[in-house]
From Swiss-Prot:
It comes from Mus musculus (Mouse). Its EC number is 2.4.2.1. GO terms for biological process: adenosine catabolic process; allantoin metabolic process; alpha-beta T cell differentiation; amide catabolic process; AMP catabolic process; AMP salvage; apoptotic mitochondrial changes; B cell differentiation. This is Purine nucleoside phosphorylase. The gene is Pnp. Disruption phenotype: At 10-week old, mice have a smaller cerebellum, corpus callosum and thalamus and motor abnormalities. Normal number of Purkinje cells in the cerebellum at birth but numbers start to decrease as mice get older. Purkinje cells in the cerebellum have an irregular shape, a granular cytoplasm and degenerated dendrites characterized by fewer dendritic spines processes. Loss of inosine phosphorylase activity in cerebellum, liver and kidney. Keywords: Acetylation, Cytoplasm, Glycosyltransferase, Purine salvage, Transferase. It is an enzyme of class 2 (transferase). Its main location: cytoplasm. A purine D-ribonucleoside binds at Y88, E201, M219, N243, H257.
Length: 289
């Protein structure tokens, strides 16, 4: 499906936000399932429900509050999405990624994406954090791409490169920050693969995804990253490994959404510290003299 939004629609939303807040965010953070508590660390927070904001879709998933929160975190002006949008909710990819282009028009230069994911890599344990080094856009293999349709050069080029989608420098800084934290949880690095959902993957699908080189699997993030890179944003992402994907027919365990939320709660304090420390490594924009 082609983009149902015009450039003016994005502008309308951005202008509305700029008129209703004095914040001019440098960083946007998209909080995944069970990770919305990150917003509690924003100082002098200003909150907008999605239903207040022109053109904004509504979040329908448990663990996604559906709020846009502006504030300060470690000296960085931020906007955080407390709840994202998914294909499985019935949204087109242009709606799933709508906020990213709005963030670009607000002046955001760095996008931080977080998600809950199932571990495909046998070396991953529940509770590990995986820095996203690369992704596999499986819906894209079937023509589902957020950039499909006429290109608007005001956002970016027709054929954007994705070989460097996730910022290497920020990943290196993340490893340094993790060592400083002295955490017992493991910080991993790997490839994230996106499925459309909402059902969890079959054993055969899980085995195929592992053969493709994926380390973790989820139902989000990739469309947002594609649009962010199209807009020229720096991207940093990580996955919280909330379950080990079942790849054996003799294994009677079944993935479920509650374990995703529970893992998010258990890791909340660690992730909040992690993101807060990382903010210090994000370069401030050059506003000129």
């Amino acid at each position: 499906m082609e983009n149902e939004f015009t450039y003016e629609d994005y502008e309308t939303t951005a202008k509305w936000l700029l008129q209703h807040t004095e914040y001019r965010p440098q960083v946007a953070v998209i909080c995944g399932s069970g990770l919305g508590g990150l917003t509690a660390h924003l100082k002098e927070a200003q909150i907008f429900d999605y239903n207040e904001i022109p053109n904004f879709p509504q979040s329908t998933v448990q663990g996604h509050a559906g709020r846009l929160v502006f504030g300060l975190l470690n000296g960085r002006c931020c906007v955080m999405m407390q709840g994202r949008f998914h294909m499985y909710e019935g949204y087109s990819l242009s709606k799933v990624t709508f906020p990213v282009r709005v963030f670009h028009l607000l002046g955001v230069e760095t996008l931080v994406v977080t998600n809950a994911a199932g571990g495909l890599n046998p070396n991953f344990e529940v509770g590990d954090i995986m820095l996203i080094r690369d992704h596999i856009n499986l819906p894209g293999f079937c023509g589902q791409n957020p950039l499909r349709g006429p290109n608007d050069e005001r956002f970016g080029v027709r054929f954007p490169a994705m070989s460097d989608a996730y910022d290497r420098d920020m990943r290196q800084k993340a490893f340094t920050a993790w060592k400083q934290m002295g955490e017992q949880r493991k910080l991993q690095e790997g490839t994230y693969v996106m499925l459309a959902g909402p059902n969890f993957e079959t054993v055969a699908e899980s085995r195929l995804l592992k053969m493709l080189g994926a380390d973790a699997v989820g139902m989000s993030t990739v469309p947002e990253v594609i649009v962010a890179r199209h807009c020229g944003l720096r991207v940093f992402g990580f996955s919280l490994i909330t379950n080990k994907v079942v790849m054996d027919y003799e294994n009677l365990e079944k993935a479920n959404h509650m374990e995703v939320l529970d893992a998010g709660k258990a890791a909340a304090q660690t992730l909040e510290r992690f993101v807060s420390i990382l903010m210090e490594s994000i370069p401030l924009p050059d506003r000129g003299s």
